[in-house]
Amino acid sequence: MVDAGGRCAAEGWRRMEAPPEGADLVPLDRYDAARAKIAANLQWICAKAYGLDNIPEDLRDPFYIDQYEQEHIKPPVIKLLLSSELYCRVCSLILKGDQVATLQGHQSVIQALSRKGIYVMESDDTPVTDADLSQAPIKMSGHMAMVDALMMAYTVEMISIEKVVASVKRFSTFSASKELPYDLEDAMVFWINKVNLKMREITEKEVKLKQQPLESPAHQKVRYRREHLSARQSPYFPLLEDLMRDGSDGAALLAVVHYYCPEQMKLDDICLKEVPSMADSLYNIRLLREFSNEHLNKCFYLTLEDMLYAPLVLKPNVMVFIAELFWWFENVKPDFVQPRDIQELKDAKTVLQQKSSRPPVPISNATKRSFLGSPAAMSPADQPPSTQPLAEGSHRYHLHSEEPECLGKGASTFSPSHPLLPLRQKQQKVSQTEEIPDQRHRSNSLTRVDGQPRGAIGAWPDKKNRPVSQPTSFALHHAASCDVDPSSGDSVSLARSISKDSLASNIIHLTPQNQPHPSAGKSNGKSLLSNVNIEDEDEELVAIIRTDVSPPSPQMPRTSPQAPGLVASIRSPQRQADTLESKPDSFYLEPLMPAVLRPAKEKQITTKEDERGEGRPRTIMAKRPSEGSQPMVRKKVSGGHGSRDLNRTFTPIPCSEFAASIDLAEVGPQSAEATGEGQPLALGRFDTLPQGQAADGFFLHVGRAEEDEGRWYVGSQSPSSHDSEPWTILRQDSDSDVVDVEDTEQDFIGEDHPVVIPRYAGEEESAKLQEDMKVKEHEDKDDASGRSSPCLSTTSQLSSMSMASGSVKMTSFAERKLQRLNSCETKSSTSSSQKTTPDASESCPAPLTTWRQKREQSPGRHSKDPASLLASELVQLHMQLEEKRRAIEAQKKKMEALSARQRLKLGKAAFLHVVKKGKADGAPQPLRPEHFTKEFTQHNGEDLDDGTCKTEGFLVKEEQRDLSDAQDVAFVQLHKPRDPAALHDGEKHRMISTALLEDSVGEVDVNECDLSIEKLNETISTLQQAILKISQQQEQLLMKSPTVPTPGTKNNCQDQKIKAPVHFVEPLSPTGVPGHRKPPRLGQGRNSRSGRPAELKVPKDRQQGCSRSKTPTPSVETLPQSRSLPPSTHPRSPSDPGGELPEKCLFDSYRLHDESNHRTFVLSSCKDANIVSEQVNFKEGLDTSVKEAGLSSSTITGKEHTPVEEPLRSKASLIEVDLSDLKAPDEDGEVVGHESSVELGGDSDQKPGVGFFFKDEQKAEDELAKKRAAFLLKQQRKAEEARARKQQLEAEVELKRDEARRKAEEDRLRKEEEKARRELIKQEYLRRKQQQALEEQGLGKPKSKPKKPRPKSVHREESYSDSGTKCSSTHNLSQTHSGSSLSLASAATTEPESVYSGGTPSHRVESLEALPILSRNPSRSTDRDWETASAASSLASVAEYTGPKLFKEPSSKSNKPIIHNAISHCCLAGKVNEPHKNSILELEKCDANHYIILFRDAGCQFRALYCYQPDTEEIYKLTGTGPKSITKKMIDKLYKYSSDRKQFNLIPAKTMSVSVDALTIHNHLWQPKRPTVPKKTQTRK
C-alpha cells in the first residue's frame, strides 16, 4: 500500500516537474512527415527487437548529419534492415512455436505475415518483395511497409473487434446494428468513444450530486462561500470521428487512461477542453507519454510532433500504441488498472468491511448527546456498518456514512462499532501515504471568532474533501468543493480570487487561540479536529494543530483526522473510496441535511470527564488564550501524556523518504494500539479513533502525510498518547503558525515522547523547510500579485503541494501554468531540500541551505522552551506586516509599470536611442528591457498569465532573498554590488517588467499612470548611467590581463549540480520564429523552481506570437542557491548557476540563432566550454529573461565583472565583435542586433549585431580567427542562399504574372473572334431567309450556290487558324476514331453537353477546320459547300439544298438534308467510306420524312440509319447494323446535328422528337462484334 501511495505522489511530482522536452517543438511547416515516419518505425522495431532499454547505442538515433548538413540514415541501421534480422526478431515475437525457426530472411517474414492475413504492400498497393527489401541502395518505402505490416500484426495480436466489444459491454451499452465496429481502427474509435461517454456520465452524476446539496434550501447562510462554480469549466470528454485527426490532442486517450487508472492519471491533470489550444494538446501528449513511460513499459514510440500533427502515414504507429493501451488495460491489467466504475464498487465494499472490523471505541454520553441535535441525523450512523450504503463512505467527501451528522443534521448516536469516519480507518490501512482530504472550508465560516461554533457548519458537506493530491477534481467534479480553487477557471493568478486580508486573517482565526472553546463533545477525550481541515486550495490552511480547544463537533463535519497517523484520514493517493473520481456516482448517497445549531459549550454542564467518556485520564492541553491572533501552539503536557501537537506545514517528502516515514507510520498505529484500548475519538465528529489511530495530522502531501504520520504515530505511540487534543487548523497565511507548530511539536516531542526521535531523516529538513516555505509562499502570494492568494500562501503548501502531486486541475492552461509555477516552485524547493539522495542535488539543495540558515535563525526552531514560541509569534507578526508591505509595493509597481508601458509605446524612439548609445559603449545588455517590454505590450493578452506568474515568482524570491539576508550578491546586484546606480537600475527594471506583466492582469487607471511617468524618466536616465558604467567596466575588464583560474572554478563544476538550474532562454527572433523560441531549460532539474513544465505548456502558437523568451524566473532559482554558496564557489555568476546538464550538452544545446537577431557568441575555451556556453547562452537569454524576471540588465554584464566570477574571467576574456560586417547586406533579419529585438516583435529589419567571442587565454589568437572565419563563411553562405531563394521566388512570380497576362489576352481575342463569327452567321442567316422568301414567291432559285458563303468559310479559316490550337476543345478532337467521325466524336465524347457550352463548340468546329491534320475532308471547298448547304438545310431552306441532283427536294419539315450532310461530311466522310456512304444515301428514294442515325456509343461511330415516324413514335431500321426497331426503353442518348459545325451535340432530353438526328442505345443491347461487320463502319475519324 505504501508503495502505491509513494508511487502516486511521486508521479504527481514528476508530472508537474519533468522538464518539457518539447520545449522546442518543430513547427508544422518544418515538420517532415516522411522523416518522422522513418524515425517512428525504426524506433518501434528496434524497441520490439531489443527491448527499449537494450537498443544498441548506434541504433537509438537512426539519423546522422554529414558535413554538408544533409541527414542520412546511419549505415548500421541500413545494414540491419537489409539483413532482415530486425524483422525476424520482431516477427518471432508474434509467431508461435516452430514457426519461429523458419524465419530466415525477408521472404519468410513476408510469408509468415501473409499467413496471418497481413500483406506487405507499399502505398500504391504494389506488394513488397524480398528483392525490394534486399535492394541496395536501400529502398526505404519497402522497409517502411514491412515495419507497418509488423506493427499491424502486433496490433492484431493485442486488440480485436471481439475483444473491444466484450470490453465495452462491461461498462456500457451500444446498438449492435448501428455501432458495431467494422475494422480495427473503427474498433479503437469505438472503444475510446465509449470510455469517454462513460466518463461524461460519471462526471455528470458527480456534478448533479454536488449541486443537490448546494441547492438545498436548508443550508444556512452563515457560511462564506464564493460562487465560482458557474465560471468553472467542466471537463469536455471528446468523441472521435477520425482516429488521427480527432485523437491528436491526446485528450480522448488520456480520458481513457484516467478511466482505467484513476489513481495514476488524475482527471485534474488532463486538459479537457472543447477546443484545446496547441499548448493544451502538447501538454496532454506529454502527459500521455510520461504515463506510458512510467507505467506501460515505455510503449509510446512517437514524438510530441508526431502525435500533434498526426500525419496519415503514422496511422499504423498510433494504432499500435492504442492497441498496446488496450492490451495493458484489458489483458494484462496490472495493479494500477482499476477502472472507475468497478473500483467504486470495490471501494464501497472495502469501506463496509473496514467499518465492521473496526475495534469499538467508547464514546461518552456527552458526546453522543451533543450529536443528538435532531432525530433525523441518527439514521445512517446507527445502522450497522453492513447496512451503510455501499459507496457512501467512499464517496462522500466526509468520509463516512454517518455523514448526516457531519452535516450537522443531528446526531446520530454513534455506536462505537462504527466510528464517525469509518473511512479513516480504511484509508489508514490502505496507505499511510495518503493525503488527508483536507476539508476546505470557507474562511471563518467554520468558527466564529468568538469561538462559538456555528451550527451552520453542518451544512458544509458540500465542500467535499479532496485528496490533496488531487486538488479539486477538475473543478467540475465538485464545483462546490472548492471555493476558489486554484484551479478554478477564473483565477488568473491563483491569488486573484481571494482578498488578501480576509483570508489571512480568517484562517488565523481558526488557529487554536481563536478556536471555539473546547467543544462540547470530546468524546472519549479525543477532541474533535477543532477546525475542519481546510484545504480550499485557495484558502487553504496549512496545518492542523491539535490544541486542547476544539470546537464543537458541528464544526468538524468535514474534518477527518482519524487515521492513526493521518489526520483527517490521509487519503491514499489511490484515494481509496474517497476520490471523487473513483466513485463519483455514489459520492453523495445521502442528501445533505441542515446543520443543527447546538448550544454553546459554556451553556452545558457537561464535565470534561463526561465529554471524554468514562472519565478516562487524559492529558488536557492547556487552553490557549484566544487573545492573540498568532496561534501559538503551546501545549502543556500533563501526566507525561504528551499531547501530540502535530502542527506542520505540509511538505511533500521525496519518495526516498516515503519508506522511512511509512515505517514510522505503521509502527505508530501498532504502538498506539498497544497503548491502550481506547484512544478517544476525535470529538465525536470524528469518529472514534481506534486505538491505533492517532487522530492527528493532516497532510497536504502524500509525502508529507507520511512524514507526519511517522511523527504523529510517534506521538501516539507513547502509551500516554491517549490525550486528546482538539485539532486546530492553521492558516498557512500566518507564517509563524508553522513555526509555532513546529516548535510546539518539538517541545512536545522533546519533553514527553522520546519515542518521537525516530522522525524520518528528511523530517528535520522538512520542518525547516516549512518555515521557509511559508515565508516564501507568502511572498509568492503577495508579491506576485499584490493580493494574498491563499493558494500561494504558505498554505499553498497545501494546495501547492497538492498541486504538486500532480493533480492540478486544469481549467485553463494558463492557470495551470501559473499554479504550477508558483505552487510547484515552492513545492519543488521543499521536496528537493528534503531529498537526501545524491541526485537530490538536482532539486536545489542550495535553497536548502538557505532554509537551514533561516531555520536556525528562527529562535523557536530548535529551542524547546516557551520563549521560542514568543519569538515565533514575533516572526509571524513580522511576516504579516511584511505581507502588507509587499502588497502595497506591488500595487505601486503595478502603477509604475502601467505608465512605463504607455511610455514605452509612445517613446520607443527614446528607448532605442538609449539602447544604441549603450551598445556603442559596449554594453549591449541593457537593451533587452525595451525589447521585452515591447513584446509584452504587443502580446500582453497572450502570455500574460505566464509572464505574470513568472515575474511574480521572481519578485517573491527576490524578496525572500532580502528577508533572509543572504550573504551573496543578489541577482540583480550581481553586476556590481557596489554600484548603486546599477542596482537602482535593476530595481527599476524589475518594477517595469513586473508591472508590465501584471498590467495585463489588471488595468490601472490611466490617470494614475501619468503620475508615474516621472518615475519612468528617472528610470531611463538611470539606465543610461548604468549603461555607461557597464561599458566602462567592460573596457577595463578587457584591458586587464586575466588572472589565473582559481580553485573556485573547480568547485564550480561540482557545484553545478547544486546550483539551481538556470533557465536559459534565447531571445526570440523578432519575427517570432517558432524554432528559436525554445527555452532550452538547460539546467532545469526536476524540482527546479522556475522551470515548471508550465512554461513548456505555453502554447506554441503563443510562443510564436510573442518573441519574449519565456524564462519564468531564471533568477528565482538562482537566488536562494546562490546565496547559500559562499562566493568562492561561484565561478559563475549566480545568474548562471550551472545547469545540471552534462557539460557536453551545453554547447550543443545552444545553437546561436543568428538569424533571429540574437547575439552571436562563439566560445573558444573548450575546457570551460560548458560554463562559458551557459553564460553566453544565459547572457542571450538574460537579455530577455532577466528583464522578464524583473532584473536589471546590469546583471548580465555582472558575469564579466562580479568578483565571484573571478575564476571565470581568468579563463576567458571577452572580445566584442561587430557582426554587422559579418552579414551579407541583403540578408534580412539574419543577424539582427539587439536593437531590432527592442523593436516590435515582427520587425526584422537588419540591425548591426554584436557578437561576443570568449577567447581562451591559452589558445592561440589564430584559433579565434579561424572560428571567426568559419562563422563569417557560414553567414555568407546563408546570405547567398537567401539571395538565391529570393531570386528564384521572384522569377517564379514573374512567370506567373506573364502567364496570367497571356491568358487574359487570349481570352480577349477569343471573345472578339467569337463576336465576329456570330455576326457573320447572322448575316448569312438573314440573307438565306431572304432568298427563301423570294423562292417561295416563285422568283426562282437564286443562282448563288455554294460559292457565296465561301468568304465566310475562308474568313473563319484565317481568323481561327492561329487560335485553333488554343481553343479549349481542340484536344477533344484528338479522339482517334477512324474514318470521318472526328467532329462527332469530339462533340459526343468529351463535351457532350456542348449544347450548353456557349461559344466553345463553335471554336471547336473552327479549330477542326483550321487543323488540317484533324480535318479529314480531302477538299476544303467541299467543306465550304457543305457548310453553306448545311446552314441552309438547318433552316429547312430548300433554296440552299445542295444534295445530289438526282434526289427530289425534301419538304421543309424533313431532316433528310441534315442527315444527308451528316453522313456525307461527318459520319462517313472521305474516300474510304465512299461506297458505304453512297449506298446509304440511296435512301433518298425512301419516302420517310424523318431519319435517325444510330451510333454505337458516345464515340459516335456510325452503325445504322433508321426512319422515325413522329405520329406513332416508331423507329425502324432502314439499313446498317442494329436492332430492327428501337423502342423508348432502348434509347440511351439523343443527339442533334449541327450543320455549320459538322458535329453532333448531345441533347439533354430523354424523349424522342423530330428535333433528334441521332441516338445511341444502351450498351448491353449490342452483341459482340461479328466478323461480318464491314470494317468501313469502324473507320471513323
From Swiss-Prot:
Region listing for Sufficient for interaction with SPTBN1, in residue ranges: 867-888
Molecular-function GO terms, alphabetical: calmodulin binding; microtubule binding; microtubule minus-end binding; spectrin binding
Among the GO biological process terms of this entry, one is: cytoskeleton organization
Annotated region Sufficient for interaction with calmodulin: the residues are 899-918
Q: Which UniProt keywords apply?
A: Coiled coil, Cytoplasm, Cytoskeleton, Microtubule, Phosphoprotein
| Phosphothreonine modifications at | T511
Query: Where is composition skewed (Polar residues) in this entry?
Result: 1104-1132, 1361-1372
* Domain writeup: The CKK domain binds microtubules.
Functionally, this protein is described as follows: Key microtubule-organizing protein that specifically binds the minus-end of non-centrosomal microtubules and regulates their dynamics and organization. Specifically recognizes growing microtubule minus-ends and stabilizes microtubules. Acts on free microtubule minus-ends that are not capped by microtubule-nucleating proteins or other factors and protects microtubule minus-ends from depolymerization.
Protein name, entry field? Calmodulin-regulated spectrin-associated protein 1
Q: Source organism lineage? A: Eukaryota, Metazoa, Chordata, Craniata, Vertebrata
